[in-house]
A protein has these predicted regions:
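Phosphate/pyrophosphate- and phosphate-bearing ligand-binding catalytic cores of soluble enzymes
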Residues: 20-21, 72, 162-229
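Charged, low-complexity, helix/coiled-coil-prone segments
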Residues: 1, 50-62, 152-160, 212-229
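Anion-binding (especially nucleotide phosphate/pyrophosphate-binding) glycine-rich loop
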Residues: 3-137
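Structural signature of FAD isoalloxazine-binding scaffolds in flavoprotein oxidoreductases
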Residues: 34-35, 41-46, 73-91, 142-172, ...
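Residues in well-ordered beta-strands of folded domains
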Residues: 42, 85, 105-107, 130, ...
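A gly/ser-rich beta-alpha-beta helix-loop segment of oxidoreductase catalytic cores
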Residues: 113-157, 163, 228-229
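Short clusters of hydrophobic/aromatic residues that line enzyme substrate/ligand-binding pockets
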Residues: 19, 25, 31, 92, ...
Length: 231
């Protein structure tokens, strides 16, 4: 398929404001380095990201799902594929309370630290470990992010996941097969669309103190990274 055709189809799904060509990846990674992506698309709702990925698979286009770009190294020559960013999937809210548990809903592009702040402001404990982790919900679920004795596996109830066949399945904590920095998402190259977490009530001052301590300690840790190369 000609370049202009795939770009036009992506614009038809997402609108011109969400599609760009030769987009500098340095603008979308925490390291602030990296050459251009051939095409960059940032769907602003879940239906659009589903339709975008369906199109790319149908047209046999190489693509990469990008969250916050945390610890991602992009080669200077860029990426000769289509980057699909979750950065516009930002819905975050407290869904409900059930007994001593409170449930939080977060779309894939929500920053993990933002979810941790919402939890702390609502005096909800369990998410303190996430306060200093520079990643998105989608990436955090995919790799079962964690630190200082806490991890996503401890608080996630379920995630809406885009499967290889294009269907969307609500996968439970157990079905996600969360293990140390791994999950079924990574094993099968699936896409996290959103997630639901369950947290308990706690003491706000204790929650904030723990988050501050974890954030300070995290600054001294070595950084690992993923390398995205041009093809």
């Amino acid at each position: 398929m000609a370049e202009t055709e795939i770009v036009k189809k992506l614009i038809d799904i997402n609108g011109e404001q969400c599609v760009s060509e030769s987009e500098a990846m340095s603008r979308h990674t925490t390291f602030r380095i990296g050459g251009p992506a051939r095409v960059f698309v940032s769907p602003d709702n879940i239906d659009k990201i589903i339709n975008t990925i369906e199109l790319l698979k149908k047209e046999e286009q190489e693509y990469f799902i990008l969250g916050n770009g945390s610890n991602l190294l992009v080669a200077d020559e860029g990426y000769n594929g289509i980057v699909v960013s979750t950065e516009n999937l930002k819905e975050l809210n407290i869904e409900k309370e059930d007994g001593d548990m409170t449930y939080i809903y977060a779309q894939a592009g929500v920053m993990l630290s933002r979810a941790a702040v919402l939890a702390s402001e609502s005096s909800l404990t369990g998410f303190e470990f996430a306060g200093g982790i520079p990643g998105s919900i989608g990436g955090a679920v995919s790799m079962n992010a964690g630190a200082y004795g806490g991890e996503i596996k401890d608080v996630i109830v379920s995630a809406d996941v885009l499967m290889e066949d294009g269907s969307v399945v609500k996968m439970t904590n157990k079905e996600l097969e969360l293990s140390y920095r791994n999950s079924i998402i990574q094993k099968k190259n699936l896409v996290v669309l959103s997630a639901e977490f369950a947290l308990k009530k706690g003491k706000k001052e204790e929650i904030l103190a723990k988050m501050k301590d974890f954030s300070t300690r995290r600054r001294d840790k070595p950084v690992s990274y993923t390398h995205l190369r041009a093809h």
